[in-house]
């Protein structure tokens, strides 16, 4: 895949904005225990053409994205959909001890991939419309656990990826 460069880039960052807990149940280390972070997330929007306001991306138009992120990550216990302890986690939720969010992949890599696909495949087309979806691409999504640990998902429309796979 060839790198793609955009003439303009705008970023939106949510710094230490989403306190949540999860575990990597497949890990051989202490990461298989429930532990928490206050996630930071950063979105890179690229375009070669500014809109009529001379903007790459409309920051005010990201309010619904922030709400979606809060619903998924703010004071939640994120559980992998194949976690063998799923019934235990469900019991915690039934007893009002946790707000469970079940996701297909965890870790910064999995979360950044999920968010990359959501922003490009759902959010921009549905919230901003097909014209903006044709003009603008969120080409990088970073998910940060701590100052030392971050992973990102990068891609470009020109790569013709299936965003729903």
Name what the model sees in each region.
Residues 1-165:
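Charge-rich, low-complexity N-terminal segments
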């Amino acid at each position: 895949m060839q790198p793609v460069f955009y003439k303009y880039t705008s970023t939106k960052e949510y710094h230490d904005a989403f306190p949540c807990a999860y575990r990597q149940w497949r890990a051989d280390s202490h990461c298989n225990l429930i532990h928490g972070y206050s996630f930071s997330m950063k979105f890179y929007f690229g375009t070669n053409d500014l809109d009529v306001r001379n903007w790459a991306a409309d920051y005010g138009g990201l309010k619904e994205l922030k709400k979606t992120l809060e619903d998924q990550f703010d004071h939640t216990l994120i559980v992998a959909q194949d976690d063998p302890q799923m019934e235990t986690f469900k019991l915690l939720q039934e007893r009002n001890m946790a707000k469970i969010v079940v996701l297909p992949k965890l870790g910064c890599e999995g979360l950044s991939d999920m968010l990359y696909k959501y922003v490009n495949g759902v959010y921009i087309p549905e919230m901003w419309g097909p014209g903006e979806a044709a003009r603008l691409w969120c080409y990088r999504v970073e998910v940060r656990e701590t100052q030392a640990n971050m992973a990102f998902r990068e891609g470009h429309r020109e790569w013709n990826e299936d965003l729903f796979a």
